[in-house]
Amino acid sequence: MKFFNEIIDEVLTIGNEISDQQVDRMTKAIQGANHIFLAGAGRSGLMIRAFANRLLHLGYSVSLVGEISSPHTKSGDLFLIGSGSGETTSLVNQAKIAKDNGVVIGLFTTNSSSTLGEIADQVVIIPTQSKQSKDEALQPMGSLFEQTSL
């Protein structure tokens, strides 16, 4: 149980370091969107899918990118991306296309100076290690990012 409490403390510590201003701006973007598209890859993709489900339960119009039932994007839509590195090629390509079509881009990441960080209109930096990072954390690879991003 001690290890479990240490992990919870680690998540709480990181959560307290996330910028309230960034979260407020992202919240306003979510509230103002006509439709919200969400995408992530790997474990970050699992977290973004869970977030999409929560937004749906809150009454927002949401779709997961790549699903057969996803509508076409239009101006006034929001594309939320979860990417620890901010460099996942498929997500970068999707973000560029969406941006070119007038879609607002929101990003949850550890790396605001990444390619996705440069493309995004709204960024929430989750100050954890990415899977490429050598920083020490109790949890392996990007686990802390994934848990905190949810």
How would you name each of these model-derived features?
Residues F37-A41, L46-S149:
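Glycine-rich phosphate-binding loops that contact phosphosugars or nucleotide phosphates
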Residues F3, Q22-R25, R43, L55:
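Short, contiguous, pocket-lining structural segments
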Residues N16-G32:
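A short, well-structured juxtamembrane/interface segment
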Residues M1-N16:
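Generic N-terminal amphipathic, Lys/Arg-enriched alpha-helix
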Residues T13-D20, Y60, T128-Q129:
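Generic secondary-structure signature for well-ordered alpha-helical cores
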